[in-house]
């Protein structure tokens, strides 16, 4: 119903949540946006790119979830923009309007090594196995969204798997089975609580550059705060 630069007012005909992702359709192009305010039947959305060409009456599709990122093998060795578009797979020097790419390669195979076994009791963020991503051991964890305790029914044998292949089957307290792959989604604005202790950085990372080490020292592992 209104367009001011990257801020668009949308008339909605259903439930809409704060920070929900939506797509504004402009011909064959879909522009990603985020709900920043809800006021009755109107939602104010902020578009992540140019709104040139968007007109009153364009259809808007709400996705029912917040801005999410995919977590899995390939994440640590890729370059992304702020929407987790893989820059290495995008064509040209500049990003095309409405162009989005898959953040992780679903066809690449990774050498999976199990660390859990059948019968283990696990909770969210417990390790099920790992893959080598470069020189780093990339831990494959119980999905962060899982609540309570689960029993490991089976874990895939060591070998090569794609990120969407099932590497473990977990059983909850109701006896329901859940297939777990090497990838999971998580909303970027929600803190991950799947940890017992959060260590604080305590050691200075010596860069050898005096102006950094003296005036702007950096802790190994980031700020941690």
PLM regions and their residue ranges:
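Short alpha-helix capping/helix-loop boundary micro-motifs
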Residues: 7-11, 43-49, 106-117, 151-155, ...
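P-loop NTPase nucleotide-binding/switch module
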Residues: 90-126, 130-133, 140-145, 162-223
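Short polar/acidic secondary-structure junctions
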Residues: 13-15, 27, 133, 145, ...
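Conserved, well-folded catalytic cores of nucleic-acid-processing
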Residues: 3, 25, 38-41, 50-51, ...
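Short, compositionally biased
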Residues: 36-42, 73-84, 135-159, 177-196
């Amino acid at each position: 119903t209104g367009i001011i630069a990257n801020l668009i007012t949308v008339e909605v005909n259903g439930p809409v949540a704060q920070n929900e992702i939506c797509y504004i359709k402009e011909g064959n192009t879909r522009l990603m946006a985020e709900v920043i305010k809800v006021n009755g039947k109107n939602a104010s959305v902020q578009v992540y790119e140019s709104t040139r060409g968007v007109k009153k009456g364009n259809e808007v599709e709400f996705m029912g979830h917040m801005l999410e990122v995919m977590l899995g093998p390939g994440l640590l060795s890729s370059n992304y923009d702020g929407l987790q578009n893989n820059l290495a797979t995008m064509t040209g020097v500049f990003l095309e309007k409405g162009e989005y790419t898959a953040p992780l390669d679903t066809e690449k195979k990774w050498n999976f090594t199990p660390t859990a076994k059948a019968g283990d009791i696990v909770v969210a963020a417990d390790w099920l196995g790992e893959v080598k991503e470069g020189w780093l051991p990339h831990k494959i964890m119980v999905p962060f969204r899982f609540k309570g305790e689960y029993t490991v029914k089976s874990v895939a044998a060591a070998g090569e798997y794609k990120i969407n292949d099932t590497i473990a089957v977990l059983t909850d307290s109701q006896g329901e089975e859940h297939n777990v792959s090497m990838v999971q989604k998580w909303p970027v604005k929600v803190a991950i609580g799947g940890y017992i202790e959060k260590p604080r950085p305590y050691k200075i990372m010596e860069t050898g550059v005096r102006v950094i080490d003296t005036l702007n020292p950096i802790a190994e592992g980031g700020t941690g705060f």
